[in-house]
């Protein structure tokens, strides 16, 4: 390829067309000459390759991450540090040239001014270098040397630069290097849409060199920022909204995870609109194209072409772009960290592999949730949520900050923590934290225990143990273990790329591609073979019906199973029509993993009910997947919509949008391991040894477990004796709790607990109290339907009292109010049948 600086240059009249919002554009002629090709309306694509980089080199994903999305090789706008350094070194090299050599390089991009009739728009060296990048080694051309094109001297091309400062000359030379890089990228880039955007930027920078102006991307794309609040503000709001009630150290952990996520986004390579189109609905593609083009022009390309103004992705984009990219970016991020986990130090490994996935899952709820407050422009938290920590004054009541449950168990949820029973010594001074008195009994201590107080350090220590093979002694666990989850094999095969899942369907406009059609034929064959009583023509009609979709399971390039379904968004449910896995691939967990993927797909589309008619052989499978014969969807919503099968049973499955179904069995397994280790540690703390049982020598054959000495002190509780009556109907539970809370708030002793504690009254309250709560926050939680069981409600009431007693001296007015209120609400709980009398 010819040296870019010696390539034919565009005429001064050729202005770059303002960059428009992406729209269908004619496909340009392959590999056009950047100097003469017309500028089509650009659409987004990956970024260019540096002129100095070898062909086929790829960009990295930024610090600690990998590139998301595919792109062609060699990419300066998505550079790793080495590529950025190459561009910087090239510019430093050019700026260090003698002035005569600088004028020669700028003359290549400067129109001839010998006379008005000369249309030459760039000086052509009569002795061009024999190889690219050899121009810097050649001696500077004389100002009298004639242009190979117009035969006017170089001086006529650079006369306008005679009185220009050295700084301005260097700025123009920086644009020259960027133009050369973009020139190479236009020719190397294979994606048509990408080529168009680079070509536009190439022309824009050439025009700016010619006119000695600064580049400004014009058109209907708008100017940064494009959304408010931006991604960074939304994520920081999320951390404050979800984790502000944590202890400072744990809150800092969440903050570090958020900064790591934002850093990854700023250096992440987005997928092209063509790739996005394959997994999204048509109406979303146009919006994504606009955002993608903005990202290319304002964030991606300027990373190495610093002549263009650069903005951070998380500073100029908001919820719209994040919704488009989050699911793909999250999967690629976690996979990248999983592959490179051995390179991480143990502390970071626990943080990233254990806490980061849950952090992203919770963030996902706020990104796709309909009423998340973190995206409101005026988002604020009560003043009590500040993180400033200073010495505390006299005693104050307990209070809380609004929050929702966080990582469990890894972030502090779960078992009760042990309380110190050391002597408290003298009466605590004002401002001094109380310890438990010497004569406190075990029953008294139990009253102060509140669920969710496992120290973060203990959880991290347990997590390191269960993830360290050397520390986990005992029999080797494997996929052959009797305790392995049904979908464990399928999940591992998916991670290794052995199997793939694709949601596909027939399409008439545009016509489905050949690969999709072949997969649909394969699905038709699988369903026909596995469902012999179903007419083949009927199966073919539904599989190829554009209104139906199929989640296809692909192994070694061929279809081995799938679930055919039809979505009814207006009715709020989906009908599952066919579900089958080829016979020689069964009993491997593929069916369970298929259904879990289907559940997550529907959660993303906000459809939370499945309906299906199951024959006698399929009822067992559907029961294992959470289906029930108890139909909650009103008959009026599905009557006339779904197909009725003779001899089949209608079954329903309600989806929980908070559950990551494809990882659920893995999460439960980890939770069991954590609880088991915590129990082992608890057992090690119990020093008391009881004598052996002598009753068996006297002929007694068995005794109740609760009569074993010391069994209750270990925390054991009898099974099947659930205290209180659990209300199944959510509306009935809501009404009961609402009335109870209103009575508690109207009690004369409730006044200290009505509002969150103000930091002006107790500056260190949130340092001492790790899980604050108050009646105002309980009212907000009740209104948002947070209390799905009575246990959650009772636990918050208990914590109100426990926090007050932990913070304040026992003879304070606040503790007296707490005791009076405690007696009252326990009386009301018993009266309402919520606990045993």
UniProtKB/Swiss-Prot annotation:
Residues 1-99, 407-434 are annotated as: Disordered. Keywords: Acetylation, Acyltransferase, Bromodomain, Chromosome, Cytoplasm, Cytoskeleton, Host-virus interaction, Isopeptide bond, Nucleus, Phosphoprotein, Transcription, Transcription regulation, Transferase, Ubl conjugation. The modification Phosphoserine is found at residue 307. Its EC number is 2.3.1.48, 2.3.1.-. Residues 639-648 are annotated as: Loop 3. Its main location: nucleus. Changing residue 645 to A: Reduced histone succinylation without affecting histone acetylation. Reduced gene expression. Residues 75-87, 416-425 have a biased composition (Low complexity). The modification Phosphothreonine is found at residue 735. Changing residue 567 to A: Reduced ability to acetylate and inhibit PPARGC1A. Residues 88-99 have a biased composition (Basic residues). GO terms for biological process: cellular response to nerve growth factor stimulus; cellular response to tumor necrosis factor; chromatin remodeling; fibroblast proliferation; gluconeogenesis; heart development; in utero embryonic development; internal peptidyl-lysine acetylation. Acetyl-CoA binds at residues 579-581, 586-592, 617. Loop3 is required for substrate specificity and adopts different structural conformations in succinyl-CoA-bound and acetyl-CoA-bound forms. Tyr-645 has an important role in the selective binding of succinyl-CoA over acetyl-CoA. This is Histone acetyltransferase KAT2A. It comes from Homo sapiens. The gene is KAT2A.
């Amino acid at each position: 390829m010819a040296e870019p600086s010696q390539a034919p240059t565009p005429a001064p009249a050729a202005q770059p067309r303002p960059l428009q919002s992406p729209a269908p554009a004619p496909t340009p002629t392959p590999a056009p000459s950047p100097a003469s090709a017309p500028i089509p309306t650009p659409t987004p694509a990956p970024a260019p390759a540096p002129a100095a980089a070898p062909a086929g080199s790829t960009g990295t994903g930024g610090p600690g991450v990998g590139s998301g999305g595919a792109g062609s090789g060699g990419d300066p706008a998505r550079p790793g540090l080495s590529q950025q350094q190459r561009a910087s070194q090239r510019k430093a090299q050019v700026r260090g040239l003698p002035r005569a050599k600088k004028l020669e390089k700028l003359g290549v991009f400067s129109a001839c001014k010998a006379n008005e009739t000369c249309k030459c728009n760039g000086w052509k060296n009569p002795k061009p270098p024999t190889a690219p990048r050899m121009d810097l080694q050649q001696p500077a051309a004389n100002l009298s040397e004639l242009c190979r094109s117009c035969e006017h001297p170089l001086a006529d091309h650079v006369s306008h630069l005679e009185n220009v400062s050295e700084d301005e000359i260097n700025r123009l030379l920086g644009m020259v290097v960027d133009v050369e890089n973009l020139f190479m990228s236009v020719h190397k880039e294979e994606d048509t849409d990408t080529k168009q955007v680079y070509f536009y930027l190439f022309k824009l920078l050439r025009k700016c060199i010619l006119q000695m102006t600064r580049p400004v991307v014009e058109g209907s794309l708008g100017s940064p920022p494009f959304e408010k609040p931006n991604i960074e503000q939304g994520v920081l709001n999320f951390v404050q909204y979800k984790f502000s009630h944590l202890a400072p150290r744990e809150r800092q952990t969440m903050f570090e995870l958020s900064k790591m996520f934002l850093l990854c986004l700023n250096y992440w390579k987005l997928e092209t609109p063509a790739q996005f189109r394959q997994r999204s609905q048509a109406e979303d593609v146009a919006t994504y194209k606009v955002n993608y083009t903005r990202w290319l022009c304002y964030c991606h390309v300027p990373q190495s072409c610093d002549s263009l103004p650069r903005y951070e992705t998380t500073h100029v984009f908001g919820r719209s772009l994040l919704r488009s990219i989050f699911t793909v970016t999250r999967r690629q991020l976690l996979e990248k960290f999983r592959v490179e986990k051995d390179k991480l130090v143990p502390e970071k490994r626990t943080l990233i592999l254990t806490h980061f996935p849950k952090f992203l899952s919770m963030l996902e709820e706020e990104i796709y949730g309909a009423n998340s407050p973190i995206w409101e422009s005026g988002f604020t938290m009560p003043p009590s949520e500040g993180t400033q920590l200073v010495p505390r004054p006299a005693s104050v009541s307990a209070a809380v900050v609004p929050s929702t449950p966080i990582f469990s168990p890894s972030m502090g949820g779960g078992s009760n923590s042990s309380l110190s029973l050391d002597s408290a010594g003298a009466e605590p001074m004002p401002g001094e934290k109380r310890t438990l008195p010497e004569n406190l009994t075990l029953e008294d201590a139990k009253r102060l225990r509140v669920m969710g107080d496992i120290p973060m350090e203990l959880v991290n220590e347990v997590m390191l143990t269960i993830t360290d093979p050397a520390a986990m002694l005992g029999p080797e666990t494997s996929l052959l273990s009797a305790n392995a989850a049904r979908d464990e094999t399928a999940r591992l095969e998916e991670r290794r790329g052995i199997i793939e899942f694709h949601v596909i369907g027939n399409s008439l406009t545009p016509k489905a591609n050949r690969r999709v059609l072949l997969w649909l034929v394969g699905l038709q064959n699988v369903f026909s073979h596995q469902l012999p009583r179903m007419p083949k023509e009927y199966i073919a009609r539904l599989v190829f019906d554009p209104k139906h979709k199929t989640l296809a399971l692909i192994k070694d390039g061929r279809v081995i199973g799938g679930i055919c379904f039809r979505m009814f968004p207006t009715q709020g449910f989906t009908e599952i029509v066919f579900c089958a896995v080829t016979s020689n691939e069964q009993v491997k967990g593929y069916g369970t993993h298929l259904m879990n993927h289907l559940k997550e797909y529907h959660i993303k589309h906000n459809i939370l009910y499945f309906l299906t008619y199951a024959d006698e052989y399929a009822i067992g499978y559907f029961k294992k997947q959470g289906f029930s014969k108890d139909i909650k969807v009103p008959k009026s919503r599905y009557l006339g919509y779904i197909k009725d099968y003779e001899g089949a049973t209608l079954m329903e499955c309600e989806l929980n949008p908070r559950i990551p179904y494809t990882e659920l069995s893995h999460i439960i397994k980890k939770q069991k391991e954590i609880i088991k280790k915590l129990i082992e540690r608890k057992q090690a703390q119990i020093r008391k040894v009881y004598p052996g049982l002598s009753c068996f020598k006297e002929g007694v054959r068995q005794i109740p477990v609760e009569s074993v000495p010391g069994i209750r002190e270990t925390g054991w509780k009898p099974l099947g004796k659930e205290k209180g009556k659990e209300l199944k109907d959510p509306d009935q539970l809501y009404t009961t709790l609402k009335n109870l809370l209103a009575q508690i708030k109207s009690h004369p002793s409730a006044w200290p607990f009505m509002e969150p504690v103000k930091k002006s009254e107790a500056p260190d309250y949130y340092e001492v109290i790790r899980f604050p709560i108050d009646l105002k926050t309980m009212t907000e939680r009740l209104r948002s339907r947070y209390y799905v069981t009575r246990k959650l409600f009772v636990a918050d009431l208990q914590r109100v009292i426990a926090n007050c007693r932990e913070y304040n001296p026992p003879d304070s007015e606040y503790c007296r109010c707490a005791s009076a209120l405690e007696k009252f609400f326990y009386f009301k709980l018993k009266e309402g049948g919520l606990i045993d009398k």
